[in-house]
Each structure stands twice: as structure tokens, then as C-alpha cells.
């Protein structure tokens, strides 16, 4: 049987009118989570990324939700996937991510993967050359202009349905033992798809 995939770490958020003052700030960079096997093995949610001032308003990018096995996936920056015929995929947090992918296949425990990390999902700019301002691992991410770090969507398990991702995220995940290949994010457009679900021995 397949357990759920882990969620991605919390990513980049946008804010307007935030006042930064001279004081101590605690900055946490969240970590991506691991998958978990077993019939009811819900994966782990991704860690939040945050900036927390000693006094004032915190900024928290919520980690991606875990994928579910026979259980439902958990809501996060992007929602987790869930197994086909048992539970639907979890929704993403409003303003922080997209829904996870649904599971699929011929068995009820082929789970969906975890959701991608939080990001500026669905954000657009008025700049006609805005494509060059997405962080994609090449020099466009260091040029002057508006930079948008888009979060990925959750992937589907086996023959499941992939979710809509954050400006290049999303994609169909494969189950650990084979099945459909995953779809990665598109260059110059942001995050990739959610990670794949796990498979335990004998499944």
C-alpha cells in the first residue's frame, strides 16, 4: 500500500504596508517533509517559514500539506493529496497555495503526494517582461525588477489527477513502484510540482 507524500517547505509571500523597525527578528527557514508508508500513512506536512519580530506582526509562509494514504491529506500552504476512491485532495490555504492532487489507480491506497510549499501563487505583475522576474535558478533571478517566488501545486498519485500549481507548479506524481511520471515546473515560471507518494514493501 502507498503512504502519503511529504509537503514542501513554506516559501515566499508578498505583503503591502508592512512596517519593519530596528529590533530583533527570529527567522526560520522551513524544511520539506518526508513521506510515510502504510495503509493509513499520512505524510508529514512541510515546515513553515517565518519572520517573527520581538514586537509586531509576524510573516508566516505555511508549509505544504501532507499527502494521505487511506486517510485524507492535510491542508497546508498547498493542500496534500489523498487516495483514490477514499478521500478527495485537501484544499490549499487561501492566499498561500493550491489544492493537492487526487490519488488514483486500481487500488484504494495509491495515495496522492504532498502539496507544494507556500508561495506567491497566482500573482501577476503589470510588467510586460515579467517572465524574466521569476526565480528559476538562472540569471533572471538576480536581475533588477519584481521577483516572484511561486509555490508548486500538489501532485497526483499513479493515474490520479494533478492539481493546478502556482505559476508553473503542479504536476502528476508517480507512485513509488512505478506508474505515471511526474511533471516538473516550467522554467522561468516558478515552483515545481509536489513530491511523489511512498510505497511500502509488498505493495
Predicted segments with their positions:
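Low-complexity, glycine/proline-biased repetitive segments and flexible coils/loops
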Residues: 1-203
